[in-house]
Amino acid sequence: MFTAKDFKTRRCNFLSIDGVLPVRAKTAIFNDYIYTRVLDLEMQSPPRNAALMKDQKESGPQYIAFQGDFGEKRGYYGYLGFTTFNRFFGGVSLSENGEFSACAYLDFEEIRPGDVIRTDNCCFYAQYGNKDVLSIYGKHIAKDNRAYPKAGVPSGWCSWYYYGGKVTQESILENMEILKREKLPVKYIQIDAGWQVRNGDWEENSKFPMGMKALAADIKEAGFIPGIWIAPFHFEKESKPVKEHGNDWFVRNDDGEVDPSYLIDYSVKEAREWLFELGRKISVEWGYRYIKVDLISGYLAINGYKKHGFNGLNNFCTMMRTLRSAVTEDTMLLSCTSPLGALAGYADCLRVSDDIFEKWSSLKIVAKQVLRRYFTAEYIRLDPDCLMVRLPSQHDSEAFRFCTRNEREIRTFVTFMSAAGGTLMLSDKLSLLDRKAFDLIKVLFPLNEKPAKPLDFFERDIPSVLSYGEHKGVEVYALFNWEDVQEVREINFKGPKYLKLFYANKIVRADGKFALEMSAHDSEIVYAANDAESFEVLTTSILP
């Protein structure tokens, strides 16, 4: 807490607390800053793994994890990070010699004499020998925000990665019928961007002639739960809110003009009432019980709000609180392009990565982000984005994204989705898939409900050896080769083990260590047990 005394009114950019921790950090795990108007940790923030040289310092939004020495003791793992997100976005820095900074970004807020500035909680934690320190960090966030994931993993089909903005009522109904025919055990049919008149005018366009309420009723009648996409921070110039309330609801720049990006100010009561009615209409009146909330961080103004002391973080939290209060209790909220920590306690699901896109290279980027952010599952259900299993030959003129991944890369994509332990949303045109593709999808059921833990978190840029823990008396591991050349992946055991390889469909024996030579872009699921008879619980699915 800081009180402005003997202080002239001024705009301040940050408030920093500096000190020295009793650590010598050898490796740092953190995220780079990206420009999204506000300095927050969000899904597109690039994860980093850096070996620290003498006196080297690294900085990032929200947290830094480290490996190093604690005083005279070696082999410690720890973190420095914010655990509450009520007042300001925050960042931290840590040097090899233990010097640290914890910074609250005031975003040029006007500070007046007598103002009391309260920052959020920032925590330092270290433990010996256990690399899984970020799970402790996730638990601290969960406790401090009273935020815990709901039971069950949302699964379904999403229109975005095949149809994009060209989605139609017919394409929704067609894919729904195929899901019924294939008896895939998924729940949600999510209509992504392309259904609305324009961003800001959330009514159906001419491609949805029956209307969104009637379409939701058809989806429910077919045995699914209807889902929909909205962007409550993005307003097009021709939208009604801009035309009718442009001077009142939107942030002004330093020149006193409305920002040309039309950045909404939810400190304005009438703007909140508009949002509440939108949420009520979509959830209560139309019947959608899964709402994807998108386009957030890039449209959060730093300052310029009508309410003194209101900032981008407050604007985001106000939006989420308002929307949550408007929808039914059983409505799932998925937040995309949003702050990763500040969402704790507001939404049910959180996108933790970039868009998956259509190439192998984009899958690697997403895998790095998702597998390094497994700790978010302690306070929310993580979303690793959609799964696409289509080959280059399985497209037609409606395709928005032309996928170029080959069969091996698609299988690795499926393995990754299992290891991620988050939501599972399919995003192909299902009528173009063959039996082999559907069989590959089905290996994911029953769904993995918790992220597999990376065993090489501090050693590799993209985690490649992950443990699911024990399922029905069998240890389960996922191995990945993200590289473009053949490489070896190893698992160490405390004693002899029998191993079964899922894709290779063979049983081998390992005496303390198992090494698998893997082709480029390949993956494998490995089961370990004390005797081969334990593998009788295994089926054609990844998890027993």
Give the residues covered by each predicted segment.
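Carbohydrate-recognition beta-sandwich/jelly-roll modules
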Residues: 1-187
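Solvent-exposed beta-hairpin/edge-strand motifs
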Residues: 14, 18-22, 493-505
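Carbohydrate-binding surface patches
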Residues: 58-60, 413, 417-420, 425, ...
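Solvent-exposed beta-strand/loop surfaces of large extracellular or lumenal domains
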Residues: 90-99, 500-516
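Intrinsically disordered, low-complexity Pro/Gly/Ser/Thr-rich segments with frequent PxxP/GP/PP motifs
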Residues: 108-113, 510-525, 529
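Conserved, mostly hydrophobic/aromatic
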Residues: 114, 157, 189, 219, ...
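Aromatic-lined carbohydrate-binding/catalytic grooves of carbohydrate-active enzymes
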Residues: 153-280, 284-306
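Glycan-recognition surfaces
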Residues: 241-270, 277, 318-433
